[in-house]
């Protein structure tokens, strides 16, 4: 039998009597979700974030086998016409039930350099915030589609809480995104109107 990810293979034998002198056994294999996903694939154990494939990284994160990875570890990613860029591990701590947003918990990877430039909106407005912005459409469309398919396949949707700005009649926005931007506090260590600070940490 193939060794499962956690080293345990559950086998249940249902005994069925055919004749007095012969017996037939039905073998039933039971796998957990992680085992089913990787069954039949020979995914190597982790060596380093820089050299491991995205499938190896995904398996390591799913099984909690991340001792070879550290915050700040980097890896090159080819985005085709957008060039080759560097990503790095920015967080490895698990999300807890009390998190208002998932952008700063779990296994988070960020770009360490500037991919390209793009307007937040084509007109001089930020009404609707990140949720309704052309930037969000661009990042989760053009940028996401430029990623290697192996990387796309391991990115999960993330609950993102973003600011409503200086207006007083709105609440913070909530979206589900594959990719998202760093908030002002994370980039400049300060902010003027970012009402999401404290909810995205």
Task: Locate each region found by the language model.
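Collagenous Gly-X-Y triple-helix signature in extracellular proteins
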Residues: 42-201
